[in-house]
Amino acid sequence: STLLASSAASDVYKRQMDDIIDLELEKVEQIIEKIAADPEDLDVRRVELELWKKIREMARKGRRTGLGITAEGDMLAALGLRYGTQEAIDFAVEVQKTLAVEAYRASVKMAAERGAFPVYDAAKEKDNPMIARIREADPELYAEMEKTGRRNIAMLTIAPTGTTSLMSQTTSGIEPVFRTVYKRRRKINPSDKDTHVDYEDETGEKFQEYNVYHHNFVKWLEANGYDTSKL
């Protein structure tokens, strides 16, 4: 997994993320314009038009974004920590704490450069549990946030990242390894070369099964002298 780095080079990425939010707002604006220009009767398209106007309003007010992680299970395994043990939990807590504090720090710094999100009000959120944790973890950061605000109403999202993790061949989100080995199916044309039918669904579609080995499990086997050519 990759943590937000507190370095000069990371400022480029902070600005890029902020620019991406602006691009998303522009897309919402384009959708509203398209609906407004639709020749269909206004009464028919009013619900859709008002919905997107509300989305635009809330997006502008909060500039919400979501910074998360994936491959935590692989990270713990690489460090020799067993998922679910107290040692692994304590380490994962520190990772999440670092992620949260640095995300808030980046947003506060961006607010000083480009302005806080429009509805920021330090007094209204002073008793918020998340803000209280940031205040406890870094009092100086909290004091700076009270003065300048922050760029985003929310910054952290821990998503399942299922498809992304399949693509990157890592464990998913903050979850452990699903399985070191499991079977998947792919749809086939039975007349194709080197195929065989392992499963046929109720519509007659035919599938071939194949083994999937967790990518980093294979690397572990290789590092420990196992012959992976026989997998």
Feature map (PLM): residue ranges:
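Residue-level recognition of conserved structural "scaffold" positions that shape functional pockets
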Residues: 73-75, 87, 169, 180
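Catalytic alpha/beta core of large soluble enzyme barrels
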Residues: 1, 17-33, 41, 131, ...
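Single conserved hydrophobic/aromatic residue that forms the stacking wall/gate
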Residues: 2-9, 13
